[in-house]
């Protein structure tokens, strides 16, 4: 049975961190290592972590340089065969979620992709599916539904801390470029709340996310044809989204 490392990064996350932690510590029928990386929270986050300390393998609380830096700290501490990130606004849908994941690991892929439920602020749910193939050139993956082999980080490198939003998309694109193998499983693994940095809908946040996505596209493709496709795509798409935002 493969050992699964679950990493939670958080900062001032007292509102939801308890649900996240409980959803991990209540997993059954599997070998789980749980690592929590707190960015020196000033609210009650650390006290909540301490409350569940017996179910947490390792945790640290210290200042970091952003989400990517915190995620890299988690990777450095991990000893599992596969790693996944379940951050402070996310939680597993069921107590046997990881047991379900392990039951699907039959073909030794580098990456396993499961579905994620997106919980909207205004109410309602949306199911997000992803695939690891050519489609990733235009559509990223929800890291809350993805497990990666630990050795993949040794081959591909860590998360690029110069990204504030799209560090996971950049990592998956680099993994694809390095020939990593992936498999999509049509099962829901986790729930992701609206409100994280990647789901903000104000124009400055959208503009930053689009700028980072464009950078991911252009830096992770050596094909002249794809660079032309991306240049045309962003020349059209960015003004379209700006106009759409203006008329909301």
What are these regions (language model features)?
Residues 192, 201-226:
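Catalytic core of nucleotide-sugar-dependent glycosyltransferases
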Residues 220-246:
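A transmembrane-helix-recognition feature enriched in membrane-embedded lipid enzymes
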Residues 73, 246-247:
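Short, surface-exposed amphipathic charged segments that create phosphate/polyanion-binding patches used
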